[in-house]
């Protein structure tokens, strides 16, 4: 959808993905990949399901579940959520910023306060 010199969106569907193909001027020697679709609801990225139906959102997710979700859900569940396969995450929302390494270390920034590892250190 976007391409330019040293910028753009680059994705390649994995083998077995459902894709739409068109042919330039109907010539089968010139296929054009024009899009993808989900064959069933089970194929929708899990990260996309955190955005309620009817709320604008964008989800990027790899087959191993690394994801980036941007949504207009108000409050702590909206905003931007970046997660890795191992559970590390960064959440930026109207209520604050949370950074977690997925192994117990958490930095929580809400208002003027910063809390590290469940109040092991709090800076106000």
Located regions from the model:
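Short, low-complexity, Pro/Ser/Thr/Gly-rich segments in the mature regions of secreted, periplasmic
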Residues: 119-123
């Amino acid at each position: 959808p976007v391409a330019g010199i040293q910028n753009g969106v680059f994705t390649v569907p994995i083998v077995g993905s459902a894709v739409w193909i068109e042919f330039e001027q109907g010539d089968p020697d010139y296929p054009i990949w024009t899009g993808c679709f989900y064959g069933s609801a089970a194929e929708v990225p899990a990260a996309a399901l955190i955005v309620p139906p009817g709320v604008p959102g964008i989800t990027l997710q790899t087959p191993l579940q690394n994801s980036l979700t941007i949504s207009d859900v108000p409050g702590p569940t909206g905003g931007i959520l970046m997660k890795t396969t191992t559970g590390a995450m960064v959440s930026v929302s109207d209520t604050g910023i949370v950074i977690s390494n997925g192994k117990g270390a958490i930095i929580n920034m809400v208002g003027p306060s910063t809390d590290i590892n469940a109040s092991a250190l709090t800076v106000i």
